[in-house]
Amino acid sequence: MTDRRPTIMDKAKKQWEVMALNSLLILFTNFAIFLSMPPQTEIFEDIICSKMHSESALHPQGEDDGCRGALVQSELARINGWKTTFEALPRMLLSEAWTRVVCIYSDVLPLSLVWLSGLLRSVGGGEPVIDSIMCVMVMDVFEESDRAVALLRLHSVFIVAKIFAAPASAALVALTSAWTPFLISLAMLFVAQALSFLLPETLGYVEQKEPDDSRAHKMAGKKGNLNQRFALAARLIVQNRNMAPIIIVNLVASITKSSNHFLLQYSSTKYEWSYSQSNLVLVIREASSLLTYLVLMPAASKAIRRVSSKSVTAQDKRLCQGSGLLNVFGFFSIALAGTPVVYVLALAFLSLGSGFDTAMSGFATSLVQPDQIASLHSTAATAKSLGGLVAGPLFARLMQVGFELGSGWLGIPYIAAGLFFITVLVAVCSIRIQSRSLDEDGQPLLQTDV
């Protein structure tokens, strides 16, 4: 049986298949997750509050003993923070079911058992690995010039899921109880799990588009045992001096991203909103993020290309730097917001930097050889997972410090996030853009352009 090079129609069909199935998977998974977030936080708070009050019957109740008091909120931050950490050890269907089992039987099971959900995520690797797989699939079937647009479209689906999940969750809580969206989301995750089995195989698709002699050369390079493959991955990290700052960017950016998990509790406590109200306010950020992805990021990219005579990779670097600056200003603005109006404006401003991850993914991809893309993204996924391990307890502790010091200090986690993103910017600026040529053995010779 002979291989044939795919036609334009074959290529378009494969691209449509990858985009459609990944979009559905993203939509169902993230709609389910964000549908359950406000009710889950409310259920956690109720469980903590009832446990604390039942265990301290002789303790006179004061202002600090209410469910929105510092004691309950500090414990809620601790539970959510460490839950995030154990989830980074990683996730999916079984862990979500386990979280619901602990909540249903909270009268006999301590709430801290939700931390074990992370152990059930160890099969498969969790969200970073899923994100990495989706990214590699896009890289496999799209040309370099079309990859950024494809990734932006996929992330737009992610944002759309968050936008529609918030009002749906609020409506279900208002009409029934927090348990209704909490359990419906689990059923949606089963649907998403079923969709994952339909994802097409894209490995080798790029090689099919190349001439036979080029494909034979690449396939020869793929032969070898597992040790050789690990050696190649290690060689990429050691020989490509840009890998160190790329790893730092993914590690630290994932830490700052985890601060978003506490926005619901932060805004609810600081401005005395219900969790459903806080989640609806966060929709403003998601709507602004969608505008950023669909309009502002492409417009900024075109503007940079129009005024800059540097390489496309250098222009992508400028896009990452600009997006990073917006994140720094956004986090500081959230931390210092004194009124709900200023807070909403700060959320909208932070959303202007929401394209950083996608921009950085495309920028980093352009810095390696095509056959090193998978190694690059798996390394990035590992760095993000490690960042998730640190972020949960770190931001939980910062939230607790804020509660201990008083409402004026609740923004401490977001001051820290802004400082972390300054580190990200320094790492991005340290990346050197290099032109590539091949030596006699087909290995890249790196020459500095910028």
UniProtKB/Swiss-Prot annotation:
Pathway(s) the chain acts in: Secondary metabolite biosynthesis
Annotated family: Belongs to the major facilitator superfamily.
Organism encoding this protein: Aspergillus versicolor
Topological category with respect to the lipid bilayer: Multi-pass membrane protein
Function, as annotated: MFS-type transporter; part of the cluster that mediates the biosynthesis of a highly modified cyclo-arginine-tryptophan dipeptide (cRW).
Lineage, highest ranks first: Eukaryota, Fungi, Dikarya, Ascomycota, Pezizomycotina
GO terms under cellular component: membrane
GO molecular function per UniProt: transmembrane transporter activity
Main location: membrane
TM segment ranges: 18-38, 100-120, 148-168, 171-191, 244-264, 280-300, 329-349, 408-428
Protein's name in the database: MFS-type transporter avaK
Sorted UniProt keywords: Membrane, Transmembrane, Transmembrane helix, Transport
SUPFAM superfamilies documented for this protein: MFS general substrate transporter (SSF103473)
Domain of life: Eukaryota
Subcellular location: Membrane
Listed CDD domains: MFS
